[in-house]
Every structure is written in structure tokens, then in C-alpha cells.
Amino acid sequence: MLKSDFYKKFKQLSIALTAFGLSSLSLANDFQYHPSYAAFKQNAMQSYGLSAQQVDSAMSGTRNLPNIINIMNRPGESKPWYSYKTNFLAESTIQRGVRFKQQYAETLNRAEQQFGVPQAIILGILGVETGFGSNKGSFVTRDALATLGFGYERRAQYFQDELAALIAWSYRDGVATSSVVGSYAGAVGYPQFMPSNIPKFGVDYDGNGHIDLRNSAVDAIGSIANYLAQHGWQRNQPIAFPARYTGSNPDAVIAKDLTQPMPYGVLKTQGISPMNPIVKIDDLDLVNVIQLKE
């Protein structure tokens, strides 16, 4: 059965159930009819030691959320920092961050000392991702990942893998998959970790025996710091520094995609250099040039 045929039948089934007064799909696992479901289940069983019954049970009642596909298909938005910052630097957010820092001062200091990640960076991530926990998302994570894993062809395998990780996590921690909520793309908790990253980089920083990024700000602080440390964060190294440009075409050096940094040596030949001579940077260091002001 082709994927398009699957969704036609899925839609017809939804309409039929609604006609009988059922506002939501009630089959044990409607996604089991998708052509790739069997392979997904087999992969989940092999990767995490789950049984077929465990996978099917965790998927029971999963709902298709077609609006998520529409969100994913929207064109990406690229703004310079001076335009983008207004989304995050509202007075209410700043005050929420001040209160969060005061409340978790000891934990933030402990994480900085242990992992070498400055408190400001940890706070910045928490502020951007969830407004310091005030908005962790409202989509049922299982439903979001299933919708994307079986309906978003560009990254279907990635989201199926994350769905399998979610199911494994739910059994490991005794959490019902239907109770986990997060972003439309499946990210969870204060730091918006994808499910597969929770066992990889999550830290039980409050020492209660569980990694709980949904409810424990302390675990979230330690996990963010650990994540950055595991990804090569360099203690006491500069994060950013003012640069001087002596070339004639600034558009050629300003980063268009922050995921594609350039070696400093290349940018140096194009006229970029630190304004402060104390800053030491190697030609092989990967950097981005960003414009902070108009």
C-alpha cells in the first residue's frame, strides 16, 4: 500500500468514526496499517530490547496530527539577531530568568564548576527553549513523533527512531507515552531534548534516582551543561568577541547558516580580525560572523 493510499484510508476511517459519534480514533494502534510500521516495530525491538506487545501497547491510541506536517512544511525563517532578539528579550522573560537564577543559584554554580559551562549559557538556553519552563509544549510527544515518523517523508526515519526511543524511555522510567507532552517536533522538558538524547546526555542532578527533564529544573540544568560538555565545550574559552572588518563586501563574511561555521583562517584572509588583540584564536577554529546591529 502506498503512503498516499494509507492516508486516504486513514482519513476515511476518521470520518466514519466521527459519524458514529466518536471524536477521536479508538483503534488499538491505527498506525499499524502504515507500510513501514512493521519495520519500525522490529527496529524498536532490536534497538531497545522491547517486545512486540510493548511497542503495540505504547502506541495504543496514538492520534494522527496532520497540522504538524503543515508546520514542518512552512519555509524556514532567517532573521538577523537585531530583529530576532525581540522574540526573547521581553521584560516578562527577563524577570522570569532573574527569578529562576535566584532560585537555582547553587545548582547553576555547581554545573558551571563541574562542566565548565557558564551559568549565562545555561540560562540562555532555558530562556530560549521554554521561557525557563513556562512553555514546554502542548503536543502529545508520541502523537507528534508518530505523525512525523509515518507522514513526513523527508525525515521519516529520524522521527521513527525518536519514537522508538520515547517508547523505550517510557518503559524504563514507568511513564505512560500518552502523558508526555512537548513541542510539535517531539522535544521534551525544560531543555527540549529529543527522547534519544535523554539517556545519552541527561543527568540525575537532583540525585533522586531519575532523570526528569519535564519536572526537575535541577536535572535540566545539569543535563544542558553535560550536553554541551560532551559536544566539545571548551572551558574558559571565548564564546564571542567583537570583530573588525576591513574588506569591502560584508555580505560575503556574515554567516547565512550558523550550522556551517568557517575556519577563522579563511575569514581572516577576507578581512576579519578580533578588535581586542588579547583574544587568541587559531586559524583552524570554526567561527561564524554575525551582525548584532543594523
Locations of the language-model features?
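Cell-wall glycan-active module
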Residues: M1-Q160, A165-V181, G186, S196-E294
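Functionally critical loop-and-helix segments that line ligand-binding/catalytic clefts
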Residues: Q192
